[in-house]
């Protein structure tokens, strides 16, 4: 319960101290995916959660990664707290009814969806480091081997500007059970390390990794690449950098963008377009935006607003790109989180925290 309550307070402080943007938004809600009244809550005890980061499992299904998860609607009644959790579906988001979850990782049939891998949960991370919780960033799978990798952030604390211990990787041979690896990207003492929140996209022999600071601070977005079959070897990562004359790989990273970034999401679409979505958490215009490019190194387009704040004392954030999205009209599929903004907000069907499918156009 402390996890969820603290996160709610923090998100409210960061993003709802400023007015919502009034710019025209492209994306509209299609279906609420999480709740006690949805299959997520009825079948697997995922009644309140956030994120819902989708990644292609290359077996006809998409895995959806969730953060702090409880089996009750409200923080005050929080039960069965765990993170991360994964639900699965092979239903195309373009279907008339939207996405419906069909199974959960770590459980056969119905039953409480368990944590995907170890979480210190107000204790030891397993290596002697204090850990408040673990939050997933992204997932990737490799059909050549059947292996899966999840990038995550180990959180030290949730203060006004939440502080991670490090970014890390969890590994699976089947996409059902995962183990944390020793590979880590440590945060710095100033909490400004730009490699703490990840999004990953494969293209050919390379996996491209886009990273930002935690806590929606102003800062750079960095780009690295790594051979797909060497992701667990930190020495194989190559930075994309500017040397004063030109850009190139195998250099210290230089910022490809700057801003108040929420969790980034990057996907290469079927037509070859690269799409990026994130929460622009600037103090004047908090909204979910998209950019496009022909390749991972850019240049990236100007921002297009996809989702504005609803203006009903709730908080919308996330905007994770479904891997089956396309560049066609109304075929950008986003997973958007919704938190109520105050403890005395009127009850709604969505409860305190939920994830919904939005549909938009790049």
Curated annotation (Swiss-Prot):
Residues 1-22 form the signal peptide. Glycans are attached at residues 157, 190, 280, 338. Keywords: Glycoprotein, Signal. Notoamides have been shown to exhibit antitumoral activities. Notoamides A-C show moderate cytotoxicity against HeLa and L1210 cells with IC(50) values in the range of 22-52 mg/ml, but the IC(50) value of notoamide D is greater than 100 mg/ml. Moreover, notoamide C induces G2/M-cell cycle arrest at a concentration of 6.3 mg/ml. Part of the gene cluster that mediates the biosynthesis of notoamide, a fungal indole alkaloid that belongs to a family of natural products containing a characteristic bicyclo[2.2.2]diazaoctane core. The first step of notoamide biosynthesis involves coupling of L-proline and L-tryptophan by the bimodular NRPS notE', to produce cyclo-L-tryptophan-L-proline called brevianamide F. This is Notoamide biosynthesis cluster protein J'.
């Amino acid at each position: 319960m402390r996890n969820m309550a603290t996160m709610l307070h923090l998100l409210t402080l960061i993003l709802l101290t400023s007015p919502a943007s009034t710019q025209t938004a492209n994306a509209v809600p299609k279906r609420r995916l999480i709740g006690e009244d949805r299959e997520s809550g009825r079948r697997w005890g995922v009644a309140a959660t956030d994120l819902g980061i989708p990644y292609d499992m290359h077996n006809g299904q998409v895995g959806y990664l969730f953060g702090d998860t409880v089996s009750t609607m409200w923080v005050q009644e929080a039960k069965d707290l765990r993170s991360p959790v994964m639900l699965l579906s092979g239903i195309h988001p373009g279907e008339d009814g939207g996405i419906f979850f069909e199974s959960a990782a770590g459980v056969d049939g119905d039953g409480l969806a368990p944590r995907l891998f170890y979480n210190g949960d107000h204790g030891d991370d397993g290596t002697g480091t204090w850990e408040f919780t673990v939050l997933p960033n992204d997932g990737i799978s490799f059909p050549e081997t059947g292996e899966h990798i999840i990038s995550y952030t180990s959180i030290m604390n949730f203060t006004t500007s939440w502080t991670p211990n490090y970014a890390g990787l969890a590994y699976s041979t089947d996409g059902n059970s995962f183990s944390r690896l020793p590979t880590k990207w440590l945060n710095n003492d100033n909490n400004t390390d730009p490699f703490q929140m990840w999004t990953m996209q494969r293209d050919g022999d390379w996996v491209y990794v886009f990273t930002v600071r935690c806590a929606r601070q102003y800062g750079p977005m960095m780009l690295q690449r790594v051979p797909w079959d060497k992701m667990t070897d930190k020495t194989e990562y190559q930075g994309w950098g500017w040397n004063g004359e030109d850009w190139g790989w195998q250099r210290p990273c230089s910022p490809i963008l700057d801003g108040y970034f929420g969790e980034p999401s990057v996907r290469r679409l079927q037509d070859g377009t690269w799409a990026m979505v994130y929460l622009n958490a600037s103090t004047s215009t908090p909204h979910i935006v998209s950019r496009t490019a022909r390749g991972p190194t850019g240049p990236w387009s100007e921002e297009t607003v996809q989702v504005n704040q609803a203006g009903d004392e709730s908080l919308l954030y996330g905007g994770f790109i479904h891997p089956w999205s396309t560049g066609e009209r109304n075929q950008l599929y986003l997973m958007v989180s919704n938190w109520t903004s105050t403890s005395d907000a009127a009850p709604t069907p969505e409860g305190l925290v939920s994830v919904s499918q939005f549909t938009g156009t790049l």
